[in-house]
């Protein structure tokens, strides 16, 4: 009976394809593009049929073909039926592939084409989007800045708006605090860079066709020294893919394992399929590559410092924030925003979701203190007391406050005695008993510039009230003072302060109301860091859930060579580098030294650059220019959407499309991985079907399709796509692997484009983070970390430290401090190695440059490209026909230099020079200049004083030095510069 069913299916296949082609243009076009013979047969020869595809038609022929272009062989009828089922069970299919119950031979391009055709026959009739009265169609999509409705008419985007929830969506949560009830507005809030996406899609800087550098010849002179100078000529996709695939094979044959390096940005376009932790890792693992590894560049001080006192290494040393929104609104008297400006950073991916909650706190009479070198946007919105502080000296103020707590008995003695170790040694240091220097408010004033009376007042108010500490953009972590030479000291001081006050007790916790809303976190949907379709269980968070719940083929990188991305220039230029890389699974892993080249591996000779730009995000980025032009780097390919600063150093450019031009699926703000439950930032938990709103512009393609095209030329396309799965097929597989089918059908989800997850009952919502520790209970928050082996007591009992308690003197650092005196077990105050306290440096460069995370763009995303973000005067200023990056300078410092509002100025030091437009303001501390990091523009011009960048790439000036000998963190905020009026007329690029 089952054999008869299989015969019937194979017999009917041509008719089904022809009917689908007649009805759907996408199937018709796909059918027209294929010219091949595909054969399906049983391994024992009992059944065989082949299909001839030619000139847009298909014919089925019984029996075997002598030379089929592609052949699929099945071990049994059951396997064959599973493989041809229009509603496949991928657990059965993947089992068949892994255990060779089914196999494919022949031309990879034919196998992939046939698989995609069969998938398209099944999906072409799926409906999505909502037709509007004005004739447009409304689609949904998700960005790094929040979810959008995208309106399209005649194949062109006409507008984008934040998603507004309606009565059919789940109810909002309600918090009751101090006699009032609070519920969030029923609309999504999004960041400026999200609303700029339409302008970015149609940017004149879009890369629409494959390009080759004019003086690059893969068969002859490569002229590596001309990268960044020479222009480009348009080539066909066939030419581009042939060159790239050929270079991959040449690298392997001529140089061996490790010759190909793949580099990606910290972030990319949103989505579980096209994100770099997904499709890129799958691609890279299949070809084998030297991993240019990311590091916690927004969390440096927490990872290299704070976690040694209490653990949480799998969160980069940052706490979890569960339940803190309600606890703060109910219990807290004071919020101290220390280097925390959530109104600029939007948390991470969450738009302005936290703004309303912070305004509730203001309505309730909760007081605010802001400690920052500038009167930042959060301080301006909320009001409160501003304590301007010299950059890099924050630890001195923190120590003085803790000194006052001790001498005035303003700390939680019982908590410290029962739940911590090492306090006696720490107390003696603060009181000066061990080094003869009491850390008094007067002592810190000389370092920080904060008046002793203000430090004393802060200590008194904080120590006598229930206080939330907001240390960084998320409330702990994400930018701020942790990104400096003293960043680890500062982050360590932050957790030490909380331990002294009774961390986890009602009203005493980390947070700035950016995270910790009431939410049902038992509902599962994967975040992007869970690896998407990568199949990589060692370098992503795939193993616990994603790999188990969504059957797919495992991939693994056979090359064991790694280079941290900030060390890539040294690796290429010098041929070697060493240091300490990020390890998200083990606290002690950060003490393991890496060496490049790794034994038995080749040096890097090819760089595959994927998206965005390092020049705007990595300190002392001028090093990358020299690396790109080094003769040992024989080939550079850049897969990018726009002609940004790093794309111009490529030999071959592959044009990728935006997230509005391809399919994907994801959840708002759910990155998972080391920001587990990051969706706890948003007011309404929402999963988004990222509709393909328009066709890709020009000849651009999705990242997934580009990888598939390259791998198909290498005979790996069928493996990469698991038999020809399209992005839409993968979306359906991810949907099925989640808890979404319990709430909504695939048909309805695809049509509407989003599904809100109800906040659930109180029992389904997480308890307050660290409350369990304060009350002496086992851990009860819903995070699968730390690992069982990291406990020194019973599983879930105590902290993952050597003692099981909070350690004022970190035992993990004590075991290693002889190797690195700048990272001692006792968190002693050490001045910055580059700062205004160093007179030799400060004479030439008396101003300290702070480059914060940008308010309007997302790193380089949305900057430049003539996007609407560039029209914002706080982001770029139009002077003489060119939009210049903005640098903020104190009124007094500007007057001394003859600088007026919006004058062009040269910001410079020994590392380089950048032309910016001045914003003269009283909101920046004297001696400090402030700007955003992450300019996407890099535009060197010739001047009598040498080369100067007018694009705004201030990371040319920041130091490439690591935080300390064994802490490979970056320290861009430890940067001295001088600022002078740029007297020359606006100039054109050289």
Identify what each model region corresponds to.
Residues 1-130:
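Feature captures hydrophobic
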Residues 126-410, 451, 494, 534-550, ...:
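N-terminal export/assembly segments and adjacent metallocofactor-ligating motifs
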Residues 161-163, 272-277, 346-350, 379-384, ...:
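Short acidic, glycine/serine/threonine-rich loops at helix termini
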Residues 182-189, 687-760, 839, 844, ...:
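Long, contiguous, secondary-structure-rich segments that constitute the structural scaffold
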Residues 195-202, 206-239, 271, 408-456, ...:
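N-terminal leader/propeptide and maturation segments of large enzyme subunits in energy/redox metabolism
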Residues 255-259, 412-416, 469, 505-512, ...:
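Flexible, glycine/charged-enriched surface loops at secondary-structure junctions
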Residues 276-360, 364-366, 370-371, 396, ...:
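Extended redox/cofactor-interaction regions of prokaryotic respiratory oxidoreductases
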Residues 374-377, 645, 650-688:
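Flexible glycine/proline-rich, aromatic-decorated loop/lid segments
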